[in-house]
Every structure is written in C-alpha cells, then in structure tokens.
UniProtKB/Swiss-Prot annotation:
Residues 66-157 form the ABM domain. GO terms for cellular component: membrane. It comes from Staphylococcus epidermidis (strain ATCC 35984 / DSM 28319 / BCRC 17069 / CCUG 31568 / BM 3577 / RP62A). Belongs to the TRAP family. The modification Phosphohistidine is found at residues 65, 78, 153. Keywords: Membrane, Phosphoprotein, Virulence. It is found in: Membrane. InterPro entries: ABM_dom, Dimeric_a/b-barrel, Heme-degrading_MO. This is Signal transduction protein TRAP. Contributes to virulence and biofilm formation.
Length: 167
C-alpha cells in the first residue's frame, strides 16, 4: 500500500477529488493550505505527489477526523534502526480515547519518514501527545538518536490536518 500527498488550494484539490470519486482521496485543511492524500495499491492519479510506502497501519483514514503528520528525518545509516524502533512499538493505540487511525510511512525518495495519527479531534490527540507512550516512542527526544547527519538539513516537525468543515 502507498500513500501519496499533494498540497494546493482548496478549490484545485477539491476538483481533483470530485473528478476521481472512485479513488481513496482525502482532503484536509492545514494552517496555510489544503492537502489531498491518496491511499492506493497502485500509481497515484496526482501529478507530482510525495510518495510513501505504508509499512504499518491501523484503522481507516476518514476526512472527518483530525490528523497529526509527524515528519521524522533520518540518514541512510539510521533508516533500519528507526524502522525497527517504530515497527516494534507494542502499544494498543486504540486504548487512547478518540484514537481512529495510524500510518507509518517510508519515503520512496529522500530520508524523511512520516507518522500519521488520526483522532476524533485535536483535544484527544493532545491528550495522547501528553502521554508517556508518545513521549517514549514518538517525540522528538525519543527519535532524535535516529536523525543522523540529515538532522542538519531537515527537522522533526508536526503538521496538523483538520477536517474541512472544522477549519
């Protein structure tokens, strides 16, 4: 499974979504633009998307949920260690109130992994983010040992994706 992402204006991305209703397309609002995501076993219908292989997955994407996309930089010599760390987090995320979905994404190009957490709303996500589970497994401090030299060129950061009707 692959996840493709592309940013643009609401109107432009919404037209793509309307023209391809047979595809698994999800549109969200960010602080400064809109984003469209496509989950697919095959090639994307998006023209120039960022492409990721889904290497771990729980739950289904839904446009009515709040998402946090965490960008985790790494280097070639730390990739396997980072993947091993994130693939072996043995925590039932569904135990957290409002949890909806999770995706661990490996880049098809470049060295920045992404982690998507889907929750019913931002408050539920912020509660999860304050937990020991998040701080020990997904926080910048927990993952910084895997950044390698690439940490000088790209940063660990979060981007919030809001349901269109809520933002």
């Amino acid at each position: 499974m692959y996840l493709y992402t592309s940013y643009g204006t609401y109107q432009f991305l919404n037209q793509i979504k309307l023209n391809h209703q047979e595809r698994s397309l999800f549109q969200f609002s960010t602080n400064d633009s809109s984003i469209i995501l496509e989950e697919s076993e095959g090639k994307s219908i998006l023209k120039h998307p960022s492409s990721y292989q889904v290497i771990d997955s729980t739950g289904e994407f839904n446009e009515h949920h709040f998402y946090s996309a965490i960008f985790v930089p790494t280097s070639e010599d730390h990739r396997q260690q980072l993947e091993k760390k994130l693939l072996h987090v043995d925590v039932p995320l569904s135990n957290f109130g409002g949890f909806k979905s999770y995706r661990l994404l490996k880049p098809t190009e470049g060295s920045t992994y992404k982690i998507y957490f889907g929750f019913a709303n931002r408050t539920a996500y912020e509660d999860f983010k304050a937990s020991d589970i998040f701080n020990e497994n997904f926080s910048k401090d927990a993952l910084s040992q895997y950044f390698g030299a690439s940490g000088q060129h790209s940063s660990y950061f979060e981007r919030y994706l809001y349901p269109i009707e809520d933002h």
